[in-house]
Amino acid sequence: METASFKTKLGWISVKKKSNRIFSLSFGKSNKKTDFTNIKNQINLYASGKLKNFNIDYYFEGTPLQKKIWKELSKIEYGEVTTYGLIAKKVGTSPRYVGNVCGQNKLLLIIPCHRVIRSDGKLGGFSGRGGIKLKKKLLSLEQNVQ
């Protein structure tokens, strides 16, 4: 397993890679050093509003239902939002469970759980370092770039 951290326009990002595929991307700093120039460049392009879709080889680690939810989340387009309830209906579970699975997302930005909000229009939670403040920042970035 390779791990690296780097500073981006969104702050420190930590990435973990196994068998040449990303399985974890999170906000925060790690002490390990590996070259992830391609990922760093893509995140900075995203943060500048110049990249809407990541071209990164990754995989999910989780239960079949978690994987189904994350696959559904990955379909949410840049600048769009959906609700926990709508995702829940598509995969046959509860909105609360969808929220819990979003909180376990290890591929932040790549699997855009920040694009999922409550049915009343409130943001809900966000597991990335920085919480709701960061979720607002990401949604604002995407809304302003369209």
Locations of regions flagged by a protein language model:
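Generic structural "secondary-structure junction" signal
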Residues: 56-62, 118-119, 125-128
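Residue-level detection of the helix-turn-helix DNA-binding "recognition helix"
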Residues: 103
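Acidic, glycine-rich catalytic loops of TOPRIM or P-loop NTPase phosphate-binding modules used
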Residues: 106
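Structural signal for hydrophobic
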Residues: 73, 113-114, 138
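Basic nucleic-acid-binding alpha-helical/helix-turn surface characteristic of O6-alkylguanine DNA
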Residues: 1-96, 141, 145-146
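Short Lys/Arg-enriched helix C-cap and helix-to-coil transition segments
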Residues: 109-118
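…primarily DNA-binding HTH/wHTH and HhH modules…
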Residues: 122-146
